[in-house]
Amino acid sequence: MLGTDRCVVEEWLSEFKALPDTQITSYAATLHRKKTLVPALYKVIQDSNNELLEPVCHQLFELYRSSEVRLKRFTLQFLPELMWVYLRLTVSRDRQSNGCIEALLLGIYNLEIADKDGNNKVLSFTIPSLSKPSIYHEPSTIGSMALTEGALCQHDLIRVVYSDLHPQRETFTAQNRFEVLSFLMLCYNSAIVYMPASSYQSLCRMGSRVCVSGFPRQHEKHWKELCGRIVLDPEFMVQLLTGVYYAMYNGQWDLGQEVLDDIIYRAQLELFSQPLLVANAMKNSLPFDAPDSTQEGQKVLKVEVTPTVPRISRTAITTASIRRHRWRREGAEGVNGGEESVNLNDADEGFSSGASLSSQPIGTKPSSSSQRGSLRKVATGRSAKDKETASAIKSSESPRDSVVRKQYVQQPTDLSVDSVELTPMKKHLSLPAGQVVPKINSLSLIRTASASSSKSFDYVNGSQASTSIGVGTEGGTNLAANNANRYSTVSLQEDRLGQAGEGKELLSPGAPLTKQSRSPSFNMQLISQV
């Protein structure tokens, strides 16, 4: 300690002792102007063998017990450095040099837990109402509250939480050491906005040293003195993080990041969940660059104001909304594939297209939007297979058959997907009693074109196909196919039952299709509208 610093400290000690009570207020207003006093006091506190340490601790306690608030804050700025020296001396078991600092810490603690009458204080914490807006949340995100009599009664109710009573302590023990130090850190954090920059630096240095002392990370620091391992408490580390978080945004960005990493390092080794939770939340919320410290006297944290536009959609996801989304997607896919041919689903999937306009009530739509979307989706998957089948049939047809087929295909120009309906049927159909399959040679289609669709086209008759065309009185086209039809597996099994009903009367043009009149295979009825 230099002679000039010693003279400054001795002058400060003698000045306050001779100060009358009427001048304490003016003395407190001019105390912060002594720029050389604070660094000199730090040097006295750091040197445990200094003879001025005991009178300095006594003088700091007298300032704290005075009625002037600014004198209390002057003593509080040295609190982090006093804690570090106390913990370092406790580990080294130097009880003689530690007595005055221990008495000062206990004196501040006992003054804070009691009021003027000597009764223990009860600390109160106000819980803000979530129904009122703040810079941290929007009340609309919570949901609408029911306007009841109970809600109206509790609208302006302020909820207050009270802490337990803190007993007075006469000495430090291993059981109550960090209980006292945690409470002292709480008092320091409550007045941290009034602390100078030197106090923030002392807080960061104290946090790094108490966390890494006695661990391998200590050798990476540029400290002159080495210290043993210091036992820490999770609550004390959380209070330490509270002060460090404020110091980082008020001029101590580099020191704050260093102590934050050291606290995380120690909390991971000790498996302290609460300090880990707070420290990781602080680290993840830090900006990439240091905050703007050009504005002098800035004593607030920069907090992002809640945006006016909500960032998270509050639309409830229900079964109905998922169904509507699926229908919209199928409708969009159906519009893209609207020009493609319409084919029926596979026979093994259990769907049949026995739809007829005459079999439906007047005023009802024969198909829904979802069914049309399904038909268009099926059409894209089966177009390649149908092209191969059509090319195989073309190769076996005569020139005349091809001309006839072209004329037949060009006939129903007014067909639309709206005249097609899917109706669920069973996979395996059985003929009812007395029902026979009409012979294929006697089939004549009047105004209805029956297109058989099946997954397995296993059997194709190799004989030459003959086709005849007959035009009815109403302009309908009749097509008779001989030995050129494609049979499904179900059709081949039913053909073995016998051909007893060859002369059975066929359907009339206007008669609706019934279960007996439909083909047992899965077919799709395309109705031409005149």
Curated annotation (Swiss-Prot):
GO cellular component entries: cytosol; plasma membrane
Q: Which residues carry this modification: Phosphothreonine?
A: T30, T306
Q: Polar residues: which segments have biased composition?
A: 353-373, 514-530
Subcellular localization is given as: Cytoplasm, Cytosol; Cell membrane
Q: Does the keyword Cell division apply?
A: no
Phosphoserine PTM sites in chain numbering: S321, S341, S430, S442, S444, S491
Which Pfam families does the record match to this protein?
Hyccin
Q: Which UniProt keywords apply?
A: Cell membrane, Cytoplasm, Membrane, Phosphoprotein
- Looking at the record, which segments are called Disordered? 328-410, 502-530
Q: What is its main location?
A: cytoplasm
Name the GO terms of the biological process aspect: phosphatidylinositol phosphate biosynthetic process; protein localization to plasma membrane
Domain of life of the organism encoding this protein: Eukaryota
Its subunit composition reads: Component of a phosphatidylinositol 4-kinase (PI4K) complex, composed of PI4KA, EFR3 (EFR3A or EFR3B), TTC7 (TTC7A or TTC7B) and HYCC (HYCC1 or HYCC2).
Q: What does this protein do?
A: Component of a complex required to localize phosphatidylinositol 4-kinase (PI4K) to the plasma membrane.
Q: PANTHER family recorded for this chain?
A: HYCCIN 2 (PTHR31220:SF3), HYCCIN RELATED (PTHR31220)
Q: Which family does it belong to?
A: Belongs to the Hyccin family.
Protein's name in the database: Hyccin 2
Species source reads Homo sapiens
